[in-house]
């Protein structure tokens, strides 16, 4: 088979990893007005602002993602995110010329120095240096495991896990950061556990290191000094630690500044003026203060929990005050300890005190900011921003080094005392299991250590008011008059009448007028619009009324216009000055309003051959075009340009559609005119309209359902609105956004709401089109913009298909960086069940976020079990370690079922710690829940579900327990039995009266020792995933009632999950972060179906079984490295009304990814070319720079030819400033090598890499577009965008 005819996949990450393993604080970028004023000039600056700013920004990184947050306002505000196609192993910051820059090391084998900059309304990250360190890859001897930065920013120490250390000097000369050649300090046969940079002011930089001697396993404390005069790195002190439990080290501020004597005196004290560095070390159950000269070894016990295991320190940070300092340490139990070093009253020698402070989730890093906040980068689950409420100094809970042997037992708090949760970063890490619960909108339920999270691909619509209407409504409009930006009147069209509501003081009530000029009965309203300064236009089927609002808020009719006798008005559209009416005789009437509020009709009319189905005119003050759609499936563009009288009311372009248009909207978006078309066939079409010629181009389509598509237009929407800010804080939030110097948070965009079988929303962000479901419990028929004093941004009012008036707000517009709307399922407990509440969404209850109290979570072993019949229903099992019980709950669409015989919403199963579970039928109508415990017992329950009006109940009836004999890690139903792997056999269990009965035992090849994944296909085949022997295909012989191994793999794979894609194809993942597809060749499949027994008899039986355990071998179709451990796969037939089936997967570290089949040769070739261009971007741009820098005459002339990218991106190229090699990948990592970390990537296009094309500068896009078969930039962007729009 030709390679182009094989299966090709397009991979894109919908959510990146969420395990932030690295973090550092600093002031990385100036993006606010007061930042600019502080540095005295330009946004790009850095030369004038040499003084240090407050470090109120935090940079966090997973292994593949860098993100920047600002905490200046006491909340986490994301400024930047960027995918790095490499594995980040170390991250730190260094202050250079008043601003912080990033130091990044990873598997690229380089030390990368990166700088954030604010440009064009957005934050970008650029590479300053990529200094080679070692070979690529994560290696034991590569100096990439530990990063320590001198507090004065003079040098950086990089340490390998074993032996190697290198130090780089850093300096700023003429406003440019300079990095020296590396200085080495190698110690063979020593493993480095941790390093720390000591506080020595402007003395020679000193670093402390905790290391292990491989010869005898002893642990040592080493001090290394960089001699700035000799430019040499050397060890200056080493101390063997008698206690081998040392595991933590952190530097201590210069104690001399706080009146503490650091020089004990002695003949070998060295320079008396030198600062003596101290470090605090963590051991089992105690901490110790040590110094460079070995004079001090001050110990103090750590307050420990009652009956707890050993307590060790895992994280710590230092906070310097004006005349004091303290350190916060965290133990492996999550307890925080406050450590202070004070001078002794008599000798002024250091005295260490430690006291219990609070308990928070276990953190990777702790960071304290100058304005009284602390960020805890949690190891698992959510990360929190805390505010200090007080600095507790209770002496009764304090231990001191004066009595080093004294111990203290503490009772950890379950409610915070000294800290207050100010904000949180909702993270899903780890993902233990997942389940697809809905296809439209695409919804995934995931279980983590904390709770169940729902990920929904859509945009939130938050209900504020919902009220039933007396009759079935047809349409809705809002009107703001007399120049006010707040809407005053609300019109609802019914079948033969119109309802008029008045909006005032936060209430909506019916408008009562003594003399009502509006048509409210015996006619159907087609359009209500505000025109001119104080005019309201009402268009009904039988007339058009021009109404004026007076200053006393009364209304009077100024004009009534009637169509010819026997003719009715079908459609109407307007803007501030223009009005068009479509009549039933296929004529279009055009009006304009003058400055004196008079409405003037143009005598010439447009005549259309076919019946008009829709028409539209551009929003704003005046439109140059109007659009008319006819029943002949065409859309025609007519010119309304005053300066082009020859073509006035003439057709300038036309578009042929697949079916007649049911709705049209013309709106300006991002500097271009966009025509939105809804078709009778359920297809939505978006075309762009050329402002000069009126031609239609850049056509995008999306199938939304079987019903006709109606379109509602919403203008001036804030795509980045903070959903967690309430109405009172909304105005303050807008002012904060405006301070971002016109950044993306202050830009307003239009959007259209699409009404079909479900409600959708279409909008453009950063030149990409998004068509997403609008998330609401009710399907909306029409939507109109709604702005009031209470809802000042993104407000809208709508009528639902159930006949309700709904007033609410549209939430944050999701983009590629934030694809899902995330919410939490409130897990039922005894208190919740009584109140009956189910779905807890942080966005709906912001007060719960700000006043959240930290509690210790003792639940582990969480499983999501899908129901075989209902995709929306799933069972949730969680094990409580304290009670040694398993709790089972049922959820459907975010609502939990109540228990049949109690008020609880769960059922407890005592003495049960589950390892896996599944649903089986056993040939009966009733379903059975089978739970496998870690003790090797199969617990079988009958599931009984009762449904009544607004009341769903369930009960688990225990049948019996079956002893399996060993822990079972996977099982699945097979026909009317249960398939269970035991050792190197698979067993079919049937239902018995007292236990499950073994109906069949099939032995597998001897190489299979531990089966961890299992899946079956239509009761004929089973895929078995072994912990290290890849996947084996079993064929079920019904005559023998046995499973026959027919195919295995030629490569060892450490399987974590396996799933059938079709009868001959499986997809799987392994614990090294690889995803692969294996297929049984068709000729082998034919032989198996013809009869595998007869084929086996023809084979040469002389071949030993250990060489050929199975007669057939899998063929590798696809292979891809995702840098996360796949935990589950889901095959989705038509997600979000997509045009093809796809595969969704969830990774352990929070990754949610998507694999889309490329179905045409043209798609495959295009994305192959684009991916290759992006892979070669580093080389192409660097080569282009070298060629142009060698051409001196071209540089002097300042030529700016197409394809030249360097001078556009870096104006300083004129001064010979060179872009480092590998700058466009940031860290200099080859993308092909990264995706082929363990095995070569095969037939998978890296969509994440292709989408980086959208982030490039325009000149860079042009440069690379020439390498993609000379395609235009617009076509490349459209093809990339279409993969998300039409396929997911």
UniProtKB/Swiss-Prot annotation:
Primary subcellular site in the record, as a coarse category: nucleus
Organism: Eremothecium gossypii (strain ATCC 10895 / CBS 109.51 / FGSC 9923 / NRRL Y-1056)
Biased amino acid composition, Acidic residues: 725-740
Renumbered residue ranges of the record's region Disordered: 725-744
Record function comment: Involved in pre-mRNA splicing and cell cycle control.
GO terms for cellular component: nucleus; Prp19 complex; U2 snRNP; U2-type prespliceosome
GO molecular function, one term: U2 snRNA binding
Domain of life: Eukaryota
Subcellular location as annotated: Nucleus
UniProt KW keywords: mRNA processing, mRNA splicing, Nucleus, Spliceosome
Protein name: Pre-mRNA-splicing factor RSE1
Assembly and binders: Associated with the spliceosome.
GO biological process, one term: mRNA splicing, via spliceosome
Cited InterPro entries: Beta-prop_RSE1/DDB1/CPSF1_1st, Cleavage/polyA-sp_fac_asu_C, RSE1/DDB1/CFT1/CPSF1, WD40/YVTN_repeat-like_dom_sf, WD40_repeat_dom_sf
PANTHER family: DNA REPAIR/RNA PROCESSING CPSF FAMILY (PTHR10644)
Gene for this chain: RSE1
Family to which the UniProt record says this protein belongs: Belongs to the RSE1 family.
